[in-house]
Design a protein with these regions (language model features):
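Short terminal alpha-helical segments
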Residues: 1-48
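Amphipathic alpha-helical binding modules
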Residues: 3-4, 74-101
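A very general structural signal that marks isolated residues within well-ordered alpha-helical segments
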Residues: 19, 71-72
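Long, contiguous binding/interaction regions
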Residues: 29, 72-75
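Residue-level signal for secondary-structure boundary elements
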Residues: 32, 54, 93-97
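Residue-level detector of well-ordered alpha-helical segments, enriched
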Residues: 34, 38, 55-62, 77-84
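Mature extracytoplasmic domains of secretory-pathway proteins
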Residues: 39, 43-70
Length: 101
């Protein structure tokens, strides 16, 4: 069984201001197929929930779900998604905590 990377994550509050939400709405990485669908699902989830759950752990749990959802895709698609996820986390103001391979 794989070790859960969130096990060692130190939770912290995130300061979500309108500018962060605007940048999340505007983020449109060059993805396709399952990677694009999963990125869009994650982006919607964050936009709908991050103000109620403004914590690093909650965000990383959502990102982890996206990473796991595309685990069966080809390496190039996964790499492009991982790059987009890191950009998304930079907008939010946190790192990946080891969730993104």
């Amino acid at each position: 069984m794989n070790r859960d990377p969130l096990r060692d994550v130190v939770d912290a509050p995130l300061f979500i201001v309108p500018r962060v939400l605007e940048r999340l709405r505007a983020l449109r990485p060059a993805l396709d197929g399952a990677a694009l669908a999963e990125f869009e699902r994650l982006r919607r989830c964050l936009l709908e929930g991050i103000e109620r759950h403004p914590t690093r752990f909650w965000v990383l749990r959502q990102v982890q779900k996206a990473v796991e959802a595309v685990a069966g895709e080809d390496a190039e698609s996964r790499q492009h998604l991982n790059t987009a996820l890191k950009e998304l986390l930079a907008i939010i103001g946190t790192d990946d905590g080891g969730v993104i391979p």
